[in-house]
Amino acid sequence: MFGSYEKTLDSKNRLVIPSKFRDELGETFYITLGFEKSLEFRSKKSFEEFSNKISSNNLLDSKMRELSRYIFANTIEVSSDKLGRVIILDNLLKKAEIEKDAVIVGVGNKAELWSKEKFEKITNIYENEENIKKLTQELFEKGAVL
């Protein structure tokens, strides 16, 4: 998935999922609280792969159990209605600091939902070409492949 779309949640916390994202996510998919106060949307297949990666770690390690608890306790399964809307639980919206205006962003095999204000803050840093070069260099030094 790729691209970004500005969206507004209605009074019932319903969000219209862009049709291109609906095609990839399917009618029923998973929403998880992300690490940077965003919500992550994954298809059933993608969530199963994600879940298996987490479960394949050493669950004897207390930190891994904490992370597993955090992820799975903050995940819901949702189904879209005929208009492509999903209801997002209030507790997840509060944790992600999303009130009404939001941006949904395609990020490869998942989509992320951000508050519009937070998304603008984090993306404004990269309007400067030097910041993008610095980020790219740091990632290459860590072994990233683009």
Curated annotation (Swiss-Prot):
Matching CDD domains, A to Z? MraZ_C, MraZ_N
Instruction: Give the main location.
Output: cytoplasm
One Gene Ontology MF term:
DNA-binding transcription factor activity
The protein's UniProt keywords, in alphabetical order, are: Cytoplasm, DNA-binding, Repeat, Transcription, Transcription regulation
Q: What SUPFAM superfamilies does the record tag this protein with?
A: AbrB/MazE/MraZ-like
The answer to whether UniProt assigns keyword DNA-binding to this entry is yes
Q: Where is the SpoVT-AbrB domain?
A: 4-46, 75-118
Q: Where in the cell is it found?
A: Cytoplasm, Nucleoid
Q: Which GO terms describe its biological process?
A: negative regulation of DNA-templated transcription initiation
Q: Which domain of life is it from?
A: Bacteria
Q: Which Pfam families match?
A: MraZ
Please give an example of a GO cellular component term from this record. Answer: nucleoid
Q: Which family does it belong to?
A: Belongs to the MraZ family.
Q: How does it assemble?
A: Forms oligomers.
The name this protein goes by in its record: Transcriptional regulator MraZ
Which gene name does the record give?
mraZ
